[in-house]
Curated annotation (Swiss-Prot):
This is Cobyric acid synthase. The gene is cobQ. Pathway: Cofactor biosynthesis; adenosylcobalamin biosynthesis. It comes from Clostridium tetani (strain Massachusetts / E88). Residues 249-439 form the GATase cobBQ-type domain. It holds the Pfam family GATase_3. The active site is at C329 (nucleophile), H431. It comes from the Bacteria.
Length: 491
């Protein structure tokens, strides 16, 4: 019987490039003719995605699935932790809400979850040639070792060899790699088969003596040095280079809510060459944007009250008299008349006044809506997904923005979102609403016409993503020892 080949990418800390390296390896293995699956046992992020069957998962594994040529599925990220407040999070297990917990409560659940993960992983072994596993944070969090289910604990559970990645761009990469190895147990050190230096800028010849000294100290080889290069690929943590086109003529501003979620809603906008995207964090940042986006939130009521307290709500209301506003999910709810929370899902407040810019009321329910949708308006097709606890009820005279005709592949007929009578303030529950060409093109061309600019065709975001995935794979393949990697995974 064929044995599944496994490789795990761990890192010296957060944001060292684990996700992007896993993405690259998934595309490389796919290019080489293997069936490959990405996997991360536990992810913590506010950004999430809804699968074709209505399950919720982390965005990083979605991009990795695309790199592998797969439809994203929740088993690729069985545990998703979504922070809801200080020391608290919502646990998503196998794509469905498991419950809310404090950090300590979740820590005490890990043994039980570990057993579930081990059983579930057996199903992956039967479907693929290779699985590329991503760790979280650092394996050297020695206070978490006894119940670890995402780094060395998981590598041991499934008997996966490990490559340890370090970020040279932030400085101290040799100390980070050597220090991490020092804090591992002997068994864990034996599992590490190589290191990867990520985000390198400069002359490799200057780096080589350091690599030799590092190998002498930790007794494992450097598998590759990957250059620093930015790709137009989504970032699950929202670390978006919004100012990439800082001098572009179209100014799009996003309200940076304290509990902002689903940063990836703006990724498709940032690839347009004449668009600049920036965050607004205070009244002083507001300026005169061509489009204002009020994004999703993990706690809509608390974020609305924060906007009210800092004066941004009044700026938004003032801007609505002349500017264009789009609210997405929680942002849509904020633009409505009232937000009612009878079950105290988000707040102790039973009712909170909204901004009053859209003629809808929101009622927060106990059950979360998670669904993939296709929708249209008079002349525009959109697609995306919904993740929300609230339901919006239309008041007299309210006008829906879209008609949803498909939910998770089933025919439906229901309204989504709202648009005001003037047509300049609108809201929708659909995340990813800008990913499709038609709505993005319509919104941007309306702005271009108002600024006497030439209209343009929108860039096909999915095609651009595929091109960038291939470019990423080429870069990583050129700069790491793939023969060595195939050797350690037994291929």
């Amino acid at each position: 019987m064929f044995k599944l080949a496994k490789i795990m990418i761990q890192g010296t800390g957060s944001s060292v490039g684990k996700s992007i390296l896993v993405t690259a390896l998934c595309r490389i293995f796919k290019q080489d003719g293997y069936t490959v699956c990405p996997y991360k046992s536990q992810n913590m992020a506010l950004n999430s995605y809804i699968t074709y069957d209505g399950k919720e998962m982390g965005r990083a594994q979605v991009l990795q699935a695309h790199a592998a040529g797969l439809e994203p599925e929740a088993y690729m990220n069985p545990i998703l932790l979504k922070p809801t407040g200080d020391k608290k999070c919502q646990i998503i297990f196998n794509g469905e809400v498991y419950g809310n917990s404090t950090a300590m409560e979740y820590h005490n659940m890990k043994t039980k979850f570990g057993e579930k993960l081990k059983d579930q992983f057996k199903n992956i072994e039967e479907k693929f040639d290779i699985v590329v596993i991503e760790g979280a944070g650092s394996p050297a969090e020695i206070n978490l070792r006894d119940k670890d289910i995402v780094n060395m604990g998981f590598a041991e559970m499934v008997d996966a060899p490990v490559l340890l990645a370090g970020d040279i761009d932030r400085g101290g990469v040799f100390a980070s790699l050597a220090g991490t190895m020092l804090l591992l147990t002997e068994e864990e050190r034996n599992r590490v088969k190589g290191t990867i230096i990520n985000k390198f800028r400069g002359d490799i010849e200057i780096l080589k003596p350091g690599l030799k000294m590092l190998e002498d100290i930790i007794k494992i080889p450097t598998v590759g040095v990957v250059p620093y290069l930015k790709f137009q690929l989504e970032d699950e943590d929202g670390a978006i280079d919004f100012n990439r086109n800082i001098n572009a003529p179209i100014d799009i501003a996003v309200i940076k809510l304290p509990r902002i979620s689903n940063f990836t809603d703006f990724d498709a906008l940032k690839v347009e060459e004449d668009v600049s995207i920036r965050y607004i964090t205070s009244k002083e940042d507001f300026g005169k944007p061509d489009l204002l986006i009020v994004p999703g939130s993990k706690n809509t009521i608390e974020d609305l009250l924060a906007l009210r307290k800092c004066g941004l709500e009044e700026k938004i209301k003032e801007y609505s008299k002349t500017g264009t506003i789009i609210g997405i999910c929680g942002g849509y709810q904020m633009l409505g008349k009232t937000l009612k929370d009878p079950y105290k899902v988000e707040s102790e407040e039973l009712e909170t006044q909204g901004m009053g810019l859209l003629n809808v009321d929101t009622v927060f329910e106990k059950e979360k809506v998670t669904t993939r949708v296709k929708a249209n308006s008079e002349d525009t097709e959109v697609y995306g997904y919904e993740i929300h606890m609230g339901i919006c009820n239309y008041k007299e005279g309210a006008k829906p923005l879209f008609n949803i005709y498909d939910e998770n592949g089933k025919k439906v007929n229901r309204n989504d979102g709202a648009i005001n009578e003037k047509g300049n303030v609108m809201g929708t529950y659909i995340h990813g609403v800008f990913d499709g060409v038609e709505f993005r093109e319509k919104v941007l061309n309306n702005i271009r016409k108002s600024k006497n600019m030439e209209e343009r065709n929108a860039i096909n975001y999915e095609n651009l993503r595929e091109k960038n995935l291939d470019m990423l794979a080429d870069l990583v393949r050129e700069n790491i020892d793939m023969d060595y990697i195939y050797k350690i995974i037994g291929m």
